[in-house]
């Protein structure tokens, strides 16, 4: 009965065959896992992280003039708001604004120093006056610590920042330098969330993926309008017919915020023409010192 029957024989797969199949499955999973990871990163990095309300994030260039200091004179709050509402020219300008704030607070000063053994010349340097200032912002403290570490004790007892030494450090650690600005924004963001001015909400992507989104309060929206108004006011200052005399303390704040907004040079030039003596009554002493800080922050 078995003569005409067809016989089927089953042989176990060899070890190599099984290994090859497993390898193919693993490669398939890894490939698509990689594709999904890249796709997810691209999608989520482009998702809206902030809700600016029905008025949106655009602030008109014709914002009404604002003659006071916005954001309750909080430089970091103004910096965060101006950055998110695209009012800033360059987010790196905050460094120069902080240095000007330190000069105003008596933490550091700008002085002239004679450099060179043969060809002597006057050079502006930053001198540290208070080595233990009361600084509450963590990233501001990091910047101050950096200046202290890159400073030298002069023969006259003054502790001055070594410009060349600081520049070389920044060149060698440029990634840390650039990440510092993001850290400043992150620290202020966390503070605004804690204060209830940024409201955390849940959003959904494709009805599956949930992520956090932060709603700007009306108060921060008003900050943005005021910052844009101050920027316009400072840029148009010479064109304003009915302008009031500026008090010294307000003049100092104007220059600090102008530096943060990236319009420092133009504003200083206007003020120097209108009020050539006012700067001498201020903590900056001369427009040359102000220009030095402006250039210092970029170098």
Where are the model-predicted features located?
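Acidic, Ser/Thr/Pro-rich intrinsically disordered cytosolic tails and loops
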Residues: 1-299
């Amino acid at each position: 009965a078995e003569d005409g029957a067809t016989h089927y024989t089953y042989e176990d797969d060899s070890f190599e065959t099984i290994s090859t199949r497993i390898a193919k499955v693993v490669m398939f999973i890894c490939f698509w896992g990689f594709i999904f990871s890249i796709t997810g990163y691209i999608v989520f990095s482009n998702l809206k992280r902030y809700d600016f309300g029905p008025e949106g994030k655009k602030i008109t260039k014709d914002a009404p003039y604002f003659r006071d200091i916005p954001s309750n004179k909080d430089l970091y709050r103004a910096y965060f708001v101006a950055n998110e509402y695209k009012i800033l020219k360059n987010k790196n300008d905050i460094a120069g604004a902080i240095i000007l704030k330190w000069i105003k607070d008596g933490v550091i000063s700008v002085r002239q120093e004679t450099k060179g053994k043969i060809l002597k010349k006057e050079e502006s340097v930053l001198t540290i006056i208070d080595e233990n200032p009361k600084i509450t912002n963590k990233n501001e403290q990091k910047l101050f610590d950096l200046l202290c570490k890159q400073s030298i004790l002069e023969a006259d007892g003054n502790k001055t920042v070594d410009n060349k030494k600081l520049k070389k450090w920044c060149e060698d650690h440029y990634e840390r330098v650039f990440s510092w600005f993001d850290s400043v924004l992150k620290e202020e963001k966390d503070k605004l969330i804690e204060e209830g001015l940024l409201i955390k909400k849940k959003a959904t992507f494709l009805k599956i993926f949930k992520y956090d989104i932060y709603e700007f309060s009306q108060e921060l929206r008003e900050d943005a309008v005021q910052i844009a108004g101050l920027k316009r006011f400072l840029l148009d200052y010479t064109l304003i017919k009915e302008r009031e005399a500026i008090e010294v303390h307000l003049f100092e704040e104007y220059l600090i915020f102008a530096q943060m907004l990236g319009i420092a040079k133009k504003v200083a030039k206007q003020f120097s023409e209108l009020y050539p003596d006012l700067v001498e009554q201020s903590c900056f002493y001369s427009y040359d010192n102000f220009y030095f800080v402006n250039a210092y922050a970029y170098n």
